[in-house]
Structure formats: structure tokens, C-alpha cells
Amino acid sequence: MLEKKGVSPIGKHLDRIRTKTLEQALSKHPNIQGVKEAGGSPAKIAKIIERCGDDFFVWSGNDDEAVTAMALGAKGLISVLSNVRPKKALAMLRACQKNDFRTAGRLQRELIPLIGALFCEVNPIPVKAALDLLGFDVGTPRLPLCPMEPEHLARLRAALRSCLG
């Protein structure tokens, strides 16, 4: 019945917080230190940093935008990739912290196929599959989620091989 009205009965939902709300209320709250921004807009990250100041931390929530976000002033990344390739993800972030965006960009470009594979289905399905392929017994996704589609699993396997380390 809900589907007929255009509402998904099962899923993850995000509340978008307006930049003005962050600036005027949340960034000044003593118990709020920052925000994870995963809206897919580098312009929004820049606007939050500009309006809320350097004392209010912004973390990228998108692995494929980490370098761009950090070049704009984000403090780091809340990452899916780091669960699967922690050394490479850390090397990319450390390069950003050193303002070595040439190296950071190269590392991110190398990781793009894996990042794409990690997001080809709803999280956490691909990361659980990747960890399983790496030999970690993390179990299968809980219902209503299901195991990864075979063609996506093949893509993930190839992407993992392409960026060893």
C-alpha cells in the first residue's frame, strides 16, 4: 500500500540538514563537534566549512569524494573503503593531511573501481561480501537485506584484486 503512494516501507532515510541550521544552531552547540556530509555536493561541504568555521568539523561521508572534501577543508572521512583496504585509505588521507593532493588524487583514482563496487548495492551488503572474500567471517546481511548479486560479486572480486595492499 505504501509503495503505491511512492513511499518505500523499508530502507535507510537521511534527514538533510540545511546549512543555515548547522551555522546558527548546531555548530554552536557544546555537545556537537561536527557533521558527516554525504550529500554528494562538494559545494555544500565548502559552504558548511565557510559558514561554520574551523572549529566545527566536517567529515566526508563518501569515499569517492574524500580528496575533494579534504582539499576544501574537511577534517577526514567516515569510510566504507577503510574496512576493506585500510592501508590504502589511510595513505590517501595522510597525503591529504600533508597537502600532497597529487599523491592523494592518484591513490583515490586507483581506488575508484573498488569504491564503485563497494557501493553497487546498498550498504552493508558489498562491504560484508568484500570482507568475506578477504577471509573475515562477518556473516550474511540481516533481513530484509540479502547476499550480493552474483554479477556484482564478480565485479567486487575483480576490484579487490586490482588494488591489493
Q: Where in this protein do the model-derived segments appear?
A:
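Helix N-cap/beta->alpha junction signal
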Residues: 41, 62-63, 149
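Short, well-ordered helical secondary-structure segments
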Residues: 4, 9, 22, 59, ...
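Glycine/proline-rich, positively charged
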Residues: 1-57
